């Protein structure tokens, strides 16, 4: 176990005195209608939470955690789930809240939930009853906030959830292909809470309940607000002075008084003199009461280098131990972002997960099936956070790098509750995990380093020597869980971070022997160094070592088990040659991927910055700094995705065309080292038929007469125009030429 952390909160999450409404006790379900409020004896709600998801009273759903957390503080909390946003009526169905509206788009970003990576409309929604699409608007945070303001203009609105969290500064918006303002500015909300919201939510709720106006609540960690100038007592520094990662301060020598002098001369005895004892106030740390001024919205919108620079600074100010506040100008106002909240302790995590969740959807949904709930109803979340720092992932920016783990007893109690209370349980726990399967109880072994480090990843390019990689707590948890009465199997469905797992082969043996249901998913993401370096993912050497150990231990256990690798196509830094090499690797290892994913530029991710700017925010940014190749355009993104499914005949024409253009025609054929077969006679005939039926491309310069022609007429006219001027005329006799 690691040492006691130096990053400590000012007060415990559950140390606030309960609000007077605690006398009502916990509700069976948080009410979604006036009828339910009447049954509870409530005349009003203190807080109303508006969400784009169906209400499932389960700790895997953000609104359930926030609602039950506030309820435990004594507040009366109502839920408005997936309201009709066409008018304000649905937002008034629970009446006027006494304190504030809490607004979130849901567990997923509403745009990612609605559109694919190719900007195509999805036709399902896993967070909606019966998987029905279209029950939430695009940019749901903005729309819901506007309706709340229409319904009750004087009630504060506080934003939260992943959508608002990743849009707290000026950000690139993939769907409109432009830089948008902070969602706090666009929505005109009163406050934004980013990341996991328990600490700021509880503090703000109690301060509002004590009569403090929301306009004066400006010092809460994990919140963003609109200000006209910097907060009083804070000193600022321009971001252009900080475009380098912070350093870990050296740890003082415990016997510093006995160190030799620089010139190696003997130390003369010091003359002892009596001195008055004076009490010195503690020296402020360099990051306390300090803010970083980021380039303004107007500047980052017009200058991609400044955008990349601002993104780099933001990602280096995410350690709650040493992060400074951030300030970014939007017009004549500033978005002020306070430092991140202190992570929850194990005791606080246990208390959050011990709240009286029913672990089922609200009865109002009847027998409707909610796919997101079906996926997690027999799973247990054992930790939060991720120190992997993958460039394309937003978990680190949302939940933080410091792992927040529950105790063994808390997890075991939840497994027993599932066994005893959840309908349809068959004895199989579908997952014990979190953002990553094997980071439970892992954290920095040096409290001083943990407090001051600004590394983006604790495991890239190499595992930090301060990082604990002992998987014994996880192994002990697995063993205790599977020994419970009535538990037949404990599966691990969360992704395994294999570069950490190989540091402790005992974990791989435990996993392969007892906790894999035939297939284990891991995510190498790519095989080539170019894209891997931009993703901040380990090389294939770690994958090969993990596979060797996994296969060995599976064989020892007498089991036939396989690894299912996940890959990303079209990620910044990926050239066509890289994708061809990946496809060849897949074919060599006989992988035929069914589901593949093109890179999806989500707000705030480092990879999204690369996609938009063509610069690498993982290194120092400048106008002459490294340029990153970015595969853009529908055709190139389709090609990269097609190469992951090299075995699909529908992709062969596109792959052949690309291989020929790259000078790799030798990869087309029937030999074992070829990627795709040569076209058949029937394929060539079909291609010719399609070419005959194509219509010539029209531009604004095409004559109107040609534009109005039918394809057959246009083809005839085109063939006529291509003939010589004197075609069809009788040839003159040679003798007549000289006349």
From Swiss-Prot:
Record's cofactor remark: Binds 1 [4Fe-4S] cluster. The cluster is coordinated with 3 cysteines and an exchangeable S-adenosyl-L-methionine.
Highest rank taxon of the organism: Bacteria
A GO MF label: catalytic activity
Q: Which gene encodes it?
A: ygiQ
Tell me what organism the protein belongs to.
Answer: Escherichia coli O157:H7
The answer to whether keyword Phosphoprotein applies is: no
Matching InterPro entries, A to Z? Answer: Elp3/MiaA/NifB-like_rSAM, Methylthiotransferase_CS, rSAM, rSAM_horseshoe, UPF0313, UPF0313_C, UPF0313_N
Q: What is this protein called?
A: UPF0313 protein YgiQ
* Residue segments, region Disordered: 686-739
SMART domains the UniProt entry points to: Elp3 (SM00729)
Question: SUPFAM superfamilies, per this entry?
Answer: Radical SAM enzymes (SSF102114)
Q: Which UniProt keywords apply?
A: 4Fe-4S, Iron, Iron-sulfur, Metal-binding, S-adenosyl-L-methionine
Q: A Pfam family name for this chain? A: DUF3362
Q: Where does [4Fe-4S] cluster bind?
A: 386, 390, 393
Q: Where is the composition biased (Basic residues)?
A: 729-739
User: Which cofactor does this sequence's record say it needs?
Assistant: [4Fe-4S] cluster
Q: Keyword Metal-binding: yes or no?
A: yes
What family is this? Belongs to the UPF0313 family.
Q: Where is the composition biased (Polar residues)?
A: 704-724
Ranges where the Radical SAM core domain occurs: 372-650
């Amino acid at each position: 176990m690691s040492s006691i952390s130096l990053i400590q909160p000012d007060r415990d999450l559950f140390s606030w005195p309960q609000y007077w409404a605690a006398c009502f006790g916990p509700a069976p379900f948080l009410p979604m209608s006036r009828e339910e409020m009447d049954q509870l004896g409530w005349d009003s709600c203190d807080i109303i939470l508006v969400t784009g998801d169906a209400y499932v009273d389960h700790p895997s759903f953000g609104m359930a955690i926030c609602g039950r957390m506030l309820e435990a503080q004594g507040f009366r909390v109502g839920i408005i789930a997936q309201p009709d946003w066409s008018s304000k009526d649905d937002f008034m169905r629970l009446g006027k809240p006494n304190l504030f509206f809490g607004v979130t788009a849901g567990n997923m970003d509403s745009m990612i939930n609605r559109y694919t990576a190719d900007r195509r409309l999805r036709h399902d929604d896993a967070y909606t009853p019966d998987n029905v699409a279209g029950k939430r608007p695009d940019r749901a945070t903005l729309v819901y906030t506007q309706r709340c303001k229409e319904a009750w203009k004087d009630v504060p609105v506080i934003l939260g959830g992943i959508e608002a969290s990743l849009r707290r500064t000026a950000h690139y918006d993939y769907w409109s292909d432009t830089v948008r303002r902070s969602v706090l500015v666009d929505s005109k909300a009163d406050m934004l809470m980013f990341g996991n919201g328990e600490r700021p939510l509880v503090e703000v709720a109690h301060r509002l309940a004590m009569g403090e106006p929301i306009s004066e609540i400006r010092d809460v960690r994990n919140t963003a607000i609109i200000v006209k100038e910097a907060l009083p007592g804070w000193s600022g520094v321009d971001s252009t002075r900080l475009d380098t990662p912070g350093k870990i301060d050296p740890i003082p020598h415990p016997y510093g008084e006995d160190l030799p002098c620089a010139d190696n001369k003997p130390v003369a005895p010091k003359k002892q003199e009596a001195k008055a004892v004076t009490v010195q106030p503690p020296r402020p740390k360099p990051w306390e009461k300090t803010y970083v001024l980021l380039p303004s919205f107007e500047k980052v919108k017009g200058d991609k280098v400044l955008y990349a620079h601002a993104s780099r600074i933001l990602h280096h100010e995410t350690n709650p131990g040493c992060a400074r506040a951030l300030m970014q100008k939007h017009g004549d106002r500033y978005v002020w972002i306070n430092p991140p909240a202190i992570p929850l302790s194990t005791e606080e995590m246990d208390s959050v997960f011990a709240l009286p969740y029913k672990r089922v959807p609200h009865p109002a949904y009847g027998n409707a099936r909610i796919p997101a709930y079906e996926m997690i109803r027999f799973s247990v979340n054992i930790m939060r956070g991720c120190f992997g720092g993958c460039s394309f992932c937003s978990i680190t920016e949302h939940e933080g790098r410091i792992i927040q783990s529950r105790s063994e007893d808390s997890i075991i109690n939840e497994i027993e509750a599932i066994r005893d209370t959840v309908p349809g349980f068959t004895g199989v726990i579908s997952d014990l995990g979190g953002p990553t399967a094997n980071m439970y109880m892992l954290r920095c072994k040096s409290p001083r380093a943990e407090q001051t480090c600004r590394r983006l990843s604790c495991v890239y390019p190499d595992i930090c020597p301060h990082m604990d990689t002992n998987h014994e707590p996880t192994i002990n948890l697995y063993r205790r869980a599977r020994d419970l009465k009535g538990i037949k199997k404990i599966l691990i469905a969360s992704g395994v971070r294999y570069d950490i797992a190989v540091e402790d082969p005992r974990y791989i043996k435990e996993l392969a022997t007892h906790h894999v249901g035939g297939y284990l998913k891991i995510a190498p993401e790519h095989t080539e160094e170019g894209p891997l370096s931009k993703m901040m993912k380990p090389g294939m050497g770690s994958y090969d070592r993990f596979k060797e150990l996994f296969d060995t231990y599976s064989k020892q256990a007498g089991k036939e088990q396989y690894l299912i690798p996940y890959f990303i196509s079209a990620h910044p830094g990926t050239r066509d040659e890289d994708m061809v090499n990946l496809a060849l690797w897949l074919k060599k290892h006989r992988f035929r991927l069914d589901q593949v994913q093109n890179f999806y530029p989500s707000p705030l991710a480092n990879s999204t910055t690369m996609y938009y700017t063509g610069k690498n925010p993982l290194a120092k940014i400048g106008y002459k700094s490294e340029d990153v190749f970015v595969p853009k355009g529908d055709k190139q993104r389709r090609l990269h995705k097609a190469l992951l499914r090299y075995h699909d005949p529908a992709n062969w024409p596109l792959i052949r065309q690309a291989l020929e253009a790259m000078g790799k025609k030798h990869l087309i054929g029937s030999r074992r080292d070829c990627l795709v077969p040569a076209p058949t006679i029937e394929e060539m005939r079909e291609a010719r038929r399609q070419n005959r039926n194509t219509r010539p491309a029209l531009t604004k310069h095409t004559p109107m007469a040609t534009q109005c022609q039918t394809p057959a007429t246009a083809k005839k006219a085109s063939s006529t125009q291509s003939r010589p001027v004197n075609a069809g005329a009788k040839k003159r006799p040679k003798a007549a030429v000289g006349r």
